[in-house]
Amino acid sequence: MKRNTFTRLAALALTLILALSLTACGGKDNTSADNNDSDTKATVKIGVPNDTTNEARALLLLQENGIIKLADGAGITATKNDIVENPHNVEIVEAEAAQLPNMLPDLDYAVINSNYAINAGLNPVSDSLLIEGSASAYANILTVKEGNETSPKALALKAALESKQVADYISQQYNGSVVSVVENPTDGYDASVDYDALKGQTITIAASPTPHAEILEVAKEILAAKDITLDIQSYNDYVVPNTVVDDGTVDANYFQHLPYLEDFNAQNGTHIVSISAVHVEPMGLYGGKQTTLDALSK
C-alpha cells in the first residue's frame, strides 16, 4: 500500500516538473482564451519625414486615423518614441522628407509632404490613401530676416503673393492638392510701397521647385509690371533656403511652414520671421508595397 502511494506521488511530481519545464521554455496553453495576435502579425513599414515637425505631423495623421496612439500631450514635436499603442504592428521608418517618394517600393506606406508628392508625379487628392485637412498651423509662409519685415522689397513681394491672381492660380493649377489660405486677396500691390523707387531693382527669393517656385512665377509677373525683377532660386533641401536668408544672400524664402521655422531658429540660432501665410499642402499617406489600407485594418 505504501509502495503504491509512493509510486503515484512520484508520477504526479514528474508530471508537474514536465509542465513547469514546458512553461519555462515558452510552451503555451492551447486552451487559453488570450491568444496575442500581435505576436504573429506581419510588420507594416511606414516611412515618415525625419525632421522634428514633419515627423510629428505624420504621426498625428496616423493617430487621427486610428493606426497608432501617441502619449497624452505629444503634439507637434512627437516622435516615434511617443507611440503608446501600436495595434497594427507598425514600424516607423524615418527618412529625409524629399527621399520618401523614392523609397515607396521598399515600404508598405509613406507619409509624404504634398510638394514632394507632386514633384514625384503623385496627385495628393487622387493618389493618397489618407490626407490631412487644410490645417492652418502648417500653412507655408513667406519669410525674411528679422528686421526686414517692413522693407519695401518685403512688402512688395508679400502683396504679390497675397494677390487674387496667385490664389486663382493655386486653385486652378492644383485642384485641392495645394490650397490658398489668404483670406482677403489683394490686387497684387501695397499702397504703402513706393514702387517707383523699386524700379529696376531685383528681389531674390529661395524656394522649393514645386509648388513654391511655380506659384512665385505668378508673383513675378505682378512685380514685372512695376519694372521689378523677381529672382527665384530653387533648392531641394530644408536647410539652405533658411541659411541664405539669415546670411543676407537672398531677401526672402518661401518653402516651409511655421512650426518648422520655429524649430529651425531654435536649433540653429537663426533669426528668420514669417510675414505671410500663403498656402497649405495637405500631407498624405501613400501606398508602396500596399495599394489599399487593408494591412492597417486587420
Regions found by a protein language model. Give the residues of each.
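Periplasmic-binding protein-like
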Residues: 58-59, 63, 161-182
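C-terminal motif of bacterial Sec signal peptides marking the signal peptidase cleavage site
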Residues: 20-24
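Short, well-ordered beta-strand elements
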Residues: 42-47, 198-210, 228-234
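A bilobed periplasmic-binding-protein/Venus flytrap-type ligand-binding module shared by bacterial periplasmic
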Residues: 138-156, 282-295
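Ligand-binding "clamshell"
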Residues: 106, 119-131, 263-275, 290
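Short, polar/charged alpha-helical segment
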Residues: 60-67, 75-81, 209-235, 239-240, ...
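Bacterial signal peptide processing site
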Residues: 26-29
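Short helix-initiation/N-cap motifs at beta->coil->alpha
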Residues: 74-102, 232-243
